[in-house]
Every structure is written in structure tokens, then in C-alpha cells.
Amino acid sequence: VARGANSFLEAMPQNQHLSLLWVGDSQDFRTRYFEKHFQIGLNIRELEIYFCENGVKVPHSFCFDDRTPAFAEAWYLVELLHRDLDQSKFSTSLPFDSPFMLMGDTQDHNASLYNHELEALHACLLKSVRLFQRIPSLLTPIKSLLHQPNKIALEPETFTLEYTAFSSVTTGQKIIVGFSAGDHLRPKPFYFIKDINQNFRPKNRGLDYRP
């Protein structure tokens, strides 16, 4: 999904063009709109991606079980062709390093082997979404300071769910409340708060370990 977004959306500071926004009505994550009315959606529970047109999921989705990354790339190209979108724009490159991502046509995604893990991950994300949705009401006394509109986004680079609780156009400062399912330093799920500004650099993330 991040590759599709990176192929068709203009780059934004801190790779915000890659953010997958939570859509409450459909209970899924979607890219920002590109080429006026297209999005790419993600259903984590089923490990399924699909195109959306004018906010509506369309048929011919792609499920990752027993399919290679090369198969996924071919699916993208076919779907782009069906929508008269420029296939030459699609690229597998990303603006960040991802050394453990599957590539090529030699290894299948075995989503069904991780059914319990996907179910647990989906449940954790849903619970966190509900918690983040309560933040505006909890911070009513300082509502004028809150970032509007309030977006909940899944960040592909860190695979963290993030909510911008405060944003300053003047200074570029942002205070973000987030949830992580775990990483190589902290294997268990955890919540975090990070403070970033315009000088934020991807290799100096707020979640980096500092002994």
C-alpha cells in the first residue's frame, strides 16, 4: 500500500504522503486520494488490499495468502490499467529502508499461518482507535489548541498507529499519541507520546532507543 501511495502522491514532510488514514464508516485504513478520486485500502484482519473509487471499495481485491510480492505488483499494474492510470508511475521503491520486506517471486506470503496474530493485531488497533477517538472530549478545556481535523493514521515506516493531538503551523511542532504492536527493542504492545518539529529526521525518530 505504501508503494502505491509513494508512486502517485507527491512527497510530504516526514513521509506523511504514505500515512494510511482510518476510515470509520468502512472500518479500514486508506491512502490519501490520488488522481482526484482513487485510494488504496487495507484490511489488516484479512490481509487484503483493494482500490477505492470516490470513497467506495471496488471488486477485485488482492489477498496475500499464498501469493508472492511479484504477484502483488502484477495486480497493481492490472488495476491501474483498468482505471486508465499511468502504469509507468508505479514503483516498488520507498523513501525509507525496509530490509525485511519480501520481494520478488521466490517466497509466498503465508497469511493463513498467522491468523491468530492478525486477529490479535486487528483487535489491538481497533481498541487503540477507539481510545484515540476519545481524546478530543478528554481535552475539551484546551480544545482551541488541538489539531483539526483529528486524523488517526497507520504509519507504514514504523507500523505505528498515530494521532496528532496538537499541531502548530507557526513552529511546525506536533505532539503525537501513538500505539505500537511492538518492535525489536520492545516486543510487547505499548503506547507512546512523541514531540516532533520541522527539523524531524526519519533516522532520528521519537521511538528510537536511547539508553
Language-model segment annotations:
Residues 103-183, 190:
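Aromatic/basic-lined ligand-recognition segments
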Residues 1-39:
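N-terminal ordered "arm"
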Residues 20, 32-44, 170-184:
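Broad, structure-driven detector of short, well-ordered beta-strand segments within folded domains
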Residues 189-211:
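A hydrophobic, small-residue-rich beta->alpha segment in the mid-to-C-terminal subdomain
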Residues 31-33, 58-66, 89, 177, ...:
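Short amphipathic beta-strand/extended segments with alternating polar/hydrophobic composition
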Residues 78-89, 128-142, 200:
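Secondary-structure boundary elements
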Residues 59-115:
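Long, hydrophobic, well-ordered secondary-structure blocks that form the structural core
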Residues 30-67:
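Cofactor- and metal-binding active-site motifs of prokaryotic enzymes
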